[in-house]
């Protein structure tokens, strides 16, 4: 089995500069802001999935790069993370037309889970 990054989220107060740099470095075009994704601007990743760049959604949301790994069973993935000691910031949350995601903290790192 292999792991696949389905969604890589960059949260930064410098959205325009980050999008401009990534677009120029990789010759890609980012979308207009997508409301369902927190006004993230997205671009396709090689092999499937997307990268997104968005601003903080809360005053206390720190900049972060958070990969969301694809799973066939998000509830089983949540249970496995909990068994390893993870604390969840967001449990399985559907985004209509996009998929279902969860966010957890483990070892001082933010992790994401994604099910299509």
What do the predicted segments below correspond to?
Residues 1-10, 31-32, 82-116:
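Vicinal oxygen chelate
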Residues 24-25, 83:
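Residues at alpha-helix termini
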Residues 17, 75-76, 99:
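Short alpha-helical
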Residues 28-64, 104-106, 110-116:
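Conserved short beta-strand elements that form part of the metal-binding/catalytic scaffold
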Residues 20-21, 79, 106:
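Surface-exposed charge patches
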Residues 63-82:
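Mid-chain, well-packed structural core segment of small domains
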